[in-house]
Amino acid sequence: MRVLGIETSCDETGIAIYDDEKGLLANQLYSQVKLHADYGGVVPELASRDHVRKTVPLIQAALKESGLTAKDIDAVAYTAGPGLVGALLVGATIGRSLAFAWDVPAIPVHHMEGHLLAPMLEENPPEFPFVALLVSGGHTQLISVTGIGEYELLGESIDDAAGEAFDKTAKLLGLDYPGGPMLSKLASQGVEKRFVFPRPMTDRPGLDFSFSGLKTFAANTIRNNENDDQTRADIARAFEDAVVDTLMIKCKRALDQTGFTRLVMAGGVSANRTLRTRLEEMMQKRRGEVFYARPEFCTDNGAMIAYAGMVRVKGGATADLSVSVRPRWPLAELPAA
């Protein structure tokens, strides 16, 4: 079975074709980073218009890359949410239309389930059960995963997501968009413990997160210190260390609570090298395992949507011809497969 995946939830247009026997056959991606850079963040209307321009040409490119034609596609999977409503509608409309024209199923995919399953694309995929840490610009969640669609929310951010806090703090430091990767690069030049930031909500029980106060702390630290390059790097280092420590402490608690020995990290922030290193060290001490996707599959991409669509089709998922998206869509509402 071959599934075409379409990802248009935010500022990346991702198209991929996944074969259940041969694996990934094609992967096309167009990033809108340059389009939004002058605005310091994603402009929804511009994102939607660019998806309209890029989606069909990328589908054609994916078919060419794989050496396939429309007749070889058995299902079309598209991101139906969560995300920007206009951007989602572009992918949903094109996905439904192609599925109708090709007489194949159209499968709506949950964007965060796509991220959660992205490590399954690697040579050493995780086995169930595991704790999933989903960290991106819009989400910071800890999930107990016992099977496809068997998701229990253990904790989440009550305000800013980790990725959002990275981007906002990067902006305070005068860094270009996208800020998260730029802040991490700057932090690598910083001196450890020159500044010490709080570890939010780690002094109390529970698995929820809060990062808005950390952003405010960073703003005050920036305002009260010199604006030289080394000071900015030291502040970036302190901020990154605080976020990574907080995520690690909560992961420990989630693993203790569930008794699981496997940790899956997914979402854009999971590409952060410091976070990967610290979680690897933690899981080695616990004699457990940590799994994550290669960096290009941590950020938004069509491969994870094609794979998630494949899993759902095999689980018996069906859909009618209506075009519907859900900008807000709790992961726990997904059915088991």
Curated annotation (Swiss-Prot):
CDD domains in the cross-refs: ASKHA_NBD_TsaD_bac
PROSITE patterns: GLYCOPROTEASE
Cofactor note: Binds 1 Fe(2+) ion per subunit.
Alphabetized UniProt keyword annotations: Acyltransferase, Cytoplasm, Iron, Metal-binding, Transferase, tRNA processing
Domain of life where this protein originates: Bacteria
Binding site for substrate: L134, V135, S136, G137, G138, D167, G180, N272
PANTHER family: TRNA N6-ADENOSINE THREONYLCARBAMOYLTRANSFERASE (PTHR11735), TRNA N6-ADENOSINE THREONYLCARBAMOYLTRANSFERASE, MITOCHONDRIAL (PTHR11735:SF6)
Family of the protein in this entry: Belongs to the KAE1 / TsaD family.
Physiological role: Required for the formation of a threonylcarbamoyl group on adenosine at position 37 (t(6)A37) in tRNAs that read codons beginning with adenine. Is involved in the transfer of the threonylcarbamoyl moiety of threonylcarbamoyl-AMP (TC-AMP) to the N6 group of A37, together with TsaE and TsaB. TsaD likely plays a direct catalytic role in this reaction.
Family annotation (NCBIfam families): gcp_kae1 (TIGR00329), T6A_TsaD_YgjD (TIGR03723)
Official protein name in the record: tRNA N6-adenosine threonylcarbamoyltransferase
